[in-house]
């Protein structure tokens, strides 16, 4: 974790439980981000919060600090039943929240349970049966265990809903209401809701299940963030891949995400980058959950330098120190452009966004520039200067099942072992 001085407010200057302050200090957190400086004072006084903030603003630490502070300041004699619940729309976001929460739990003695679908059914169940103080997870699996009477929600002191707008988008709102209705009354618990937008339906949810929440809002001056350098190219279809490979060689990003609009396009990009010697991870909707988590772990730790992804990875993922975002395809939804390039330039760091307005997706550009309220600076390129001497990737083999035979597995094209001299 890095120390980022975004406000003059120090965590140590706030009336936060001493154990939590020590945990923050051990993780190199000293100064509050704007959303933390705005939300923590009312939360520390026991007031509910409905906060508007984008991913990457520090909201996770804000609600974790408030949660740990409240539980430590209001101890309960009962054991083995959860005292706080943090609900997230996706498995990846739940894992990231859990990882941040571990930094605080190591110094406070509060136990955590990570609950999400797709894997680990028995191990997660056993963890809940042992007893945890804080449940972090997705609603479907949480409800599954709840209906089996594995745990009770009667002792919940803190409830957190992260990315509430995304919950609506994914159709999880019935699950949210189901869980809220089985907790103590809003007046008997501390509740926090965070969302990228405080739409009417999100505000309605807040007033329905929270106790007169204080509204806090942090919006960047520009939707795309002033620390992100934006750049636009107009490649021909023939030059598009060569331009991407050339820019990778020229920019040599420390950590980059390349977005494409389809699974097929992502596979093509990943194959060419891998053939050129880069260390690449491919993340799309049909990648198995255990493999998705391994790819994200390797990308975060630096074992992979480039992540090629569809928009499934554009929201909710907190991956620190992403230096570059490439829009190989301009997104069909203007809002997705903001979510994509928001993966870089986080927490006071600078970042670069490079977009291709190709023959197929250039028509998406006017809507994007209208939404972000500025034109993206255009850079010209010389077609004859592009990188062309790249060994083409091996063709992908379609999976077949004939006469009981398994499909032949494609061999990896190796790791990215070149570095700038």
Swiss-Prot record:
Binding site for ATP: 53-60
Extent of motif DEAD box: 162-165
Protein name per Swiss-Prot or TrEMBL: ATP-dependent RNA helicase RhlB
GO process annotations (BP): RNA catabolic process
InterPro entries registered for this protein in UniProt: DEAD/DEAH_box_helicase_dom (IPR011545), DEAD_box_RNA_helicase (IPR050079), Helicase_ATP-bd (IPR014001), Helicase_C-like (IPR001650), P-loop_NTPase (IPR027417), RNA-helicase_DEAD-box_CS (IPR000629), RNA_helicase_ATP-dep_RhlB (IPR023554), RNA_helicase_DEAD_Q_motif (IPR014014)
EC number: 3.6.4.13
Entry's Gene Ontology cellular component terms: cytosol
Cited SUPFAM superfamilies: P-loop containing nucleoside triphosphate hydrolases (SSF52540)
Boundaries of every Helicase ATP-binding domain copy: 40-216
Gene3D superfamilies from the UniProt entry: P-loop containing nucleotide triphosphate hydrolases
Role summary: DEAD-box RNA helicase involved in RNA degradation. Has RNA-dependent ATPase activity and unwinds double-stranded RNA.
Keywords, alphabetical: ATP-binding, Cytoplasm, Helicase, Hydrolase, Nucleotide-binding, RNA-binding
Family named by the database record: Belongs to the DEAD box helicase family. RhlB subfamily.
């Amino acid at each position: 974790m890095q120390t980022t001085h975004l406000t003059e407010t120090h965590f140590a200057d706030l009336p936060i439980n001493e154990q939590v302050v020590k945990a923050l200090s051990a993780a190199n957190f000293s100064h509050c981000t704007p959303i933390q400086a705005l939300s923590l004072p009312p939360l520390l006084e026991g007031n509910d919060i409905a906060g508007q903030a984008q991913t990457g603003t520090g909201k996770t630490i804000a609600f974790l600090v408030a949660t740990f502070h409240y539980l430590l300041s209001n101890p309960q004699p009962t054991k083995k039943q959860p005292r706080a619940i943090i609900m997230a729309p996706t498995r990846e976001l739940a894992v990231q929240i859990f990882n941040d929460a571990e930094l605080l739990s190591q110094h406070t003695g509060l136990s955590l349970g990570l609950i999400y679908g797709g894997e680990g059914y028995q191990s997660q169940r056993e963890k809940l049966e042992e007893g945890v103080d804080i449940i972090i997870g997705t609603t479907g699996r949480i409800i599954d265990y709840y209906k089996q009477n594995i745990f009770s929600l009667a002792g919940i002191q803190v409830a957190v809903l992260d990315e509430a707008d995304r919950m609506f988008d994914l159709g999880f709102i019935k699950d949210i209401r189901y869980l809220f209705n089985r907790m103590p009354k809003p007046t008997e618990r501390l509740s926090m809701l965070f969302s990228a937008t405080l739409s009417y339906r999100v505000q309605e949810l807040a007033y329905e299940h929270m106790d007169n929440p204080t509204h806090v809002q942090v919006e960047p001056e520009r939707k795309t963030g002033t620390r992100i350098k934006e750049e636009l190219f107009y490649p021909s279809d023939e030059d598009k891949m060569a331009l991407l490979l050339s820019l990778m060689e020229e920019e040599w990003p420390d950590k980059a995400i390349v977005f494409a609009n389809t699974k097929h396009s992502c596979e093509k990009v990943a194959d060419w980058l891998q053939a050129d010697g880069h260390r690449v991870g491919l993340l799309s909707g049909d990648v198995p959950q255990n493999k998705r988590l391994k790819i994200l772990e390797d990308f975060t730790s630096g074992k992979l330098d480039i992540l090629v992804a569809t928009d499934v990875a554009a929201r909710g993922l907190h991956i620190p120190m992403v230096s570059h975002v490439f829009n190989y395809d301009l997104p069909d939804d203007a809002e997705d452009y903001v979510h994509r390039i928001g993966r870089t330039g986080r927490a006071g760091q600078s970042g670069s966004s490079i977009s291709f307005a190709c023959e197929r997706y250039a028509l998406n550009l006017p809507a994007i520039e209208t939404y972000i309220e500025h034109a993206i600076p255009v850079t010209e390129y010389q077609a004859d200067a592009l990188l062309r001497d790249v060994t083409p990737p091996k063709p992908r083999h379609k999976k077949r099942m004939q006469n009981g035979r398994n499909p032949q597995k494609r061999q990896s094209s190796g790791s990215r072992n070149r570095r700038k001299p």
